[in-house]
């Protein structure tokens, strides 16, 4: 059993994770540190220091794994390792992660380098994909088939799988070839969640937010929301991994602190981070606050720190990543809206129905932004939302996708948009 993992960024060796006496460390290779185009594994582990200790690398690694204890326990049983040992888990699923990073054993590294790219893809039929989605709905830990060479990990609580889509074919990649799309089947009691997420992403784009492409795709009798990975791109005849990390990783926080109420970062801390690290700080701060406003308007209650990320690139470039995992709580009648809270406070207030003009003014002041400009932007977004939502509903239905959840969210968004405009006119 290995006690070292080689860290790769888009296929280049950048350092080593060491595991000794239940403690971790990460050391950058000198070759990577000397490269003028180098970028850090994490903003919490800058290139200026060659070695970083246990707390930093452990928090980063946990941030790559699912936020679901049951999934981790099942993975532990499957791989015969402790579900509480992040190093052992990553040893098995770290070959395709969020961002450009891969973690592989020294033995696997030699095979990976020597293996022809064409042998790294297991192509699937539509029936194969349907069966994988069916299995995943029944067993939320079945992100990959046991026989797959390629294993992957993504953060988040929802069951999902990741596949390569190329030349109109789906496949399971491994080694140097990354997954390009994330597939999420409908789950649990949230009927129409796949449609809800797809609709919310389209709505966000319509009001000027940057989001990945998405669609709801049917594979025989199974459906899934299919989201293009923004941390993948085609360049120079190959798939390129683009590095990213979520806000918890960037701030050296374990994923258990993703919610502000659990000690995680709130709006002000993320604004500070963007001002400290972003290559275009004011543009990214504005985009982030637009996202906060959007989630307030649609009642997107799960926009915690792990659902905001940073793109890390050459020459120290850092930018806010596209938004993802957007969804509205509005179409679910069993939810008591008087008790609904956001994942991050707005001007000191969590509760959705209590957030008004003075809270946005307080948030603007804490973010060192002109409050009139911020609030005018939110009003404009609220005013535009009902018509944009109706247009998207019509477009989606024209593409053959119809679900009561979409109709419900459109209907309730129209009412909520009017209510939010009134809240922004009254000082509460």
Annotated model-derived regions:
Residues 1-428:
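Phosphate/dinucleotide-binding and metal-coordinating scaffold of catalytic cores
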